[in-house]
């Protein structure tokens, strides 16, 4: 049996743009993707801390070092520039690997730079 577990999380990223007329997805700085192990075209869940919206889309790599977090297409209706979001990817893990699975979490600063990189969810996330 497999369980769906969090594989990676980008916590408290700031939306830099919302582009309604682009063909779907979220554009994320490729340096940030590499740091947490997310990949282009990967399905992700987006949580908007400002309005509570939760939705799914897929990743498009953005310019390295840009700090870009741009919601494209219909998803642009669910965010505004400067909203704080969480981006989460999931993975299917077999029962025998459940205790050894370690997700990567990037805690972002107000300029979309990685403030802290954690391997495994902290016991309490109060920021």
UniProtKB/Swiss-Prot annotation:
* Cellular compartments annotated: Cytoplasm
Details of cofactor binding: Binds 1 pyruvoyl group covalently per subunit.
Q: In which pathway does it act?
A: Cofactor biosynthesis; (R)-pantothenate biosynthesis; beta-alanine from L-aspartate: step 1/1
Catalytic residue positions: 25, 58
Q: Which UniProt keywords apply?
A: Autocatalytic cleavage, Cytoplasm, Decarboxylase, Lyase, Pantothenate biosynthesis, Pyruvate, Schiff base, Zymogen
The enzyme's E.C. designation: 4.1.1.11
Q: Per the entry, which co-factors are needed?
A: pyruvate
- Positions binding substrate in this chain are 57, 73-75
Write down the NCBIfam families for this protein, in alphabetical order: panD
Record-given protein name = Aspartate 1-decarboxylase
Q: Which organism is it from?
A: Anoxybacillus flavithermus (strain DSM 21510 / WK1)
């Amino acid at each position: 049996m497999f369980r769906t577990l969090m594989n990676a999380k980008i916590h408290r990223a700031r939306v830099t743009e919302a582009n309604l007329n682009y063909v779907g997805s979220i554009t994320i700085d490729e340096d940030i993707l590499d740091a947490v192990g997310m990949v282009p075209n990967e399905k992700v869940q987006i949580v908007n801390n400002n309005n509570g919206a939760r939705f799914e889309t897929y990743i498009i790599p953005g310019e390295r070092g840009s700090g870009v977090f741009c919601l494209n297409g219909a998803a642009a209706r669910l965010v505004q520039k400067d909203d704080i979001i969480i981006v989460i990817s999931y993975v299917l893990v077999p029962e025998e690997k459940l205790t050894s699975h370690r997700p990567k979490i990037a805690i972002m600063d107000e300029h979309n730079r990685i403030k802290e990189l954690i391997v495994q969810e902290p016991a309490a996330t109060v920021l």
